[in-house]
């Protein structure tokens, strides 16, 4: 039955290969479940609620992609660029509440869905040069890298130059640099789940050396605190138009750039 639906033989694969690929993809994406709540909690979101929402949304999106796309599925999860914009730009920078930000995300998502189901999607994507599609993803990656460097302590705020070199003697910076380098080495060696392995390994080192705090294996009961907790009225106000447009812009072009990159690597451009 699965072979008939997913066409394993036609695509020269089998159930075992797909299971291994699925586990490898999970290990590659698992860090998002931890990083997304960390970033959004800086903007006032509840860590437990975001963790639960991230896990549920990712699972649902992957199931839909698997059964709808069939032979061309991709792993779907919250974007690591758009969450940083919400936390640091919308909530901290513009002083919106998490509920108002969630309302803006909902409206932007509805607009994204409408555009995706109409010819507008193809027109917009085909109008963008391939170099720009790839460049958008790279730009968002650099934005995230800058945030990561600041959290590590490698960079710091400067009132004149905006960014300056941090304290290189900070032990937390050395731990962060070690984790980053280890992830790159594992990536080059083709080790699956390099990001989550690096996070776990250096978290343990931080706990042992006293620079981290271990709160147990099981934290708290999954929280559904953000289920339908969006402020739609605020999201539809005139003051939120730029926020909604920016969220849609980031989401649409980040998706276009990512899918273009994945399709280019897998040889499925134009399919």
Where are these regions (language model features)?
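Membrane-embedded helical hairpins/re-entrant loop segments and their flanking transmembrane helices
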Residues: 11, 40-56, 245-271
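Short, Lys/Arg-rich, polar N-terminal cytosolic tail immediately upstream
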Residues: 1-13
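Hydrophobic mid-bilayer segments of alpha-helices in multi-pass membrane transport proteins
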Residues: 80, 105-107, 136, 140, ...
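Flexible hinge motifs at transmembrane-helix junctions and intramembrane kinks/re-entrant loops
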Residues: 181-223, 248-252
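N-terminal membrane topogenic signal
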Residues: 10-23
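Early transmembrane hairpin of solute transport permeases
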Residues: 20-169
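Helix-loop-helix junctions that connect adjacent transmembrane segments
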Residues: 156-173, 208-249
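Transmembrane alpha-helix interface/packing and boundary motifs in multi-pass membrane proteins
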Residues: 60-74, 184-187, 246-254
């Amino acid at each position: 039955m699965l072979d008939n639906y997913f066409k394993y033989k036609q695509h020269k694969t089998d159930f075992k290969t797909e299971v291994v690929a699925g586990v490898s993809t999970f290990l590659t994406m698992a860090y998002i479940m931890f990083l997304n709540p960390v970033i959004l909690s800086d903007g006032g979101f509840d860590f437990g609620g975001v963790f639960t929402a991230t896990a549920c949304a990712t699972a649902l999106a992957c199931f839909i992609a698997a059964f709808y796309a069939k032979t061309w599925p991709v792993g779907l999860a919250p974007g690591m660029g758009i969450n940083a914009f919400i936390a640091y730009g919308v909530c901290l920078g513009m002083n919106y509440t998490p509920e108002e930000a969630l309302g803006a995300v909902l409206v932007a998502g509805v607009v994204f869905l409408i555009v995706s189901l109409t010819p507008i999607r193809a027109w917009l994507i085909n109008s963008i040069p391939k170099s720009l599609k790839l460049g958008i993803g790279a730009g968002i990656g650099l934005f995230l890298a800058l945030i990561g460097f600041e959290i590590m302590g490698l960079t710091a705020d400067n009132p004149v130059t905006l960014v300056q070199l941090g304290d290189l003697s900070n032990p937390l910076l050395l731990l962060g640099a070690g984790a980053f380098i280890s992830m790159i080495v594992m990536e080059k060696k083709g080790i699956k789940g390099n990001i989550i392995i690096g996070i776990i390994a250096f978290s343990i080192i931080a706990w042992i050396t006293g620079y981290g705090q271990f709160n147990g294996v099981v934290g708290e009961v999954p929280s559904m605190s953000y289920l339908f907790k969006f402020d739609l009225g605020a999201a539809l106000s005139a003051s939120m138009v730029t926020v909604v447009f920016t969220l849609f812009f980031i989401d649409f072009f980040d998706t276009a750039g990512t899918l273009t990159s994945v399709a280019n690597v897998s040889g499925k451009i134009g399919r």
